[in-house]
Amino acid sequence: MKRTATPDSPALFDLVDTGPDFAFELEAKKKGFWPVAGTDEAGRGPLAGPVVAAAVILDPDNIPKGMDDSKKLTRQKRESLFVQIMETSIVSVASSGPGLIDSVNILRASLDAMRRAVLGLEIPPALVLADGRDRPPGIPCEAKAVIKGDSRSLSIAAASIIAKVTRDRMMERAGVVHTSYGFEGHAGYGTPAHLRAIESHGPCALHRMSFRPLKRD
């Protein structure tokens, strides 16, 4: 994201979304922090299934083209970039299941998945760029929280794509096991069809009982 001024009013600025770039990473390298990993999660909002986190260290000489916040990409584009990222980057994935989510809350479960994803990288990073307002605790390196990081940092964007595609595939498999809920279609989100299925069949082991409307007062 960068600011540009119109020629006739240089004091007024328009926000222009140019997509993520490698500026955070290169600035960190100038300061002696290298390599840099990006981390992000997928699945904080659904009523069912895990929250999945990924950590990615990109090869600066071989960065896949077209990366962005995974939510802005088509499924086909995400799948294509997933393959490219896996082939060119150092990648680690971790997840927190419904039990942990219900036990400690979704934010802590998400940050813990990020922490484990970072610790699982084959090469330890000198700096971690984490999407959002919070830094994952318990990692043995510097960390920086980047608000809307998946739209600003290519490393975080890559992590968002890996996390999203991984979680979607997990929920597709869950739909084969738990056939009454349609997980393969809505990935656990609270769609009308999913809510009707819960009403008809009750919750299953994948449901987050601390989330409304599953939570009982």
Curated annotation (Swiss-Prot):
One GO term describing the cellular component: cytoplasm
Lineage of source species: Bacteria, Pseudomonadati, Pseudomonadota, Alphaproteobacteria, Hyphomicrobiales
Cofactor note: Manganese or magnesium. Binds 1 divalent metal ion per monomer in the absence of substrate. May bind a second metal ion after substrate binding.
Obligatory cofactor(s): Mn(2+); Mg(2+)
GO biological process: DNA replication, removal of RNA primer; mismatch repair
Coiled-coil regions listed: none
Protein task: Endonuclease that specifically degrades the RNA of RNA-DNA hybrids.
GO MF term list: manganese ion binding; RNA binding; RNA-DNA hybrid ribonuclease activity
UniProt organism field: Agrobacterium fabrum (strain C58 / ATCC 33970) (Agrobacterium tumefaciens (strain C58))
The protein's name in its UniProt record: Ribonuclease HII
Keywords, sorted A to Z: Cytoplasm, Endonuclease, Hydrolase, Manganese, Metal-binding, Nuclease
Keyword Nucleotide-binding: no
Main location: cytoplasm
Residues annotated to bind a divalent metal cation: 40-41, 131
HAMAP family per the UniProt record, alphabetical: RNase_HII_B
SUPFAM superfamilies assigned to the protein according to its UniProt record, in alphabetical order: Ribonuclease H-like
EC number: 3.1.26.4
Database matches in InterPro entries: RNase_HII, RNase_HII/HIII, RNase_HII/HIII_dom, RNaseH-like_sf, RNaseH_sf
Enzyme class: hydrolase
Domain RNase H type-2, chain residue ranges per copy: 34-217
Reactions listed under catalytic activity: Endonucleolytic cleavage to 5'-phosphomonoester
Family per record: Belongs to the RNase HII family.
Subcellular location: Cytoplasm
Pfam family, one: RNase_HII
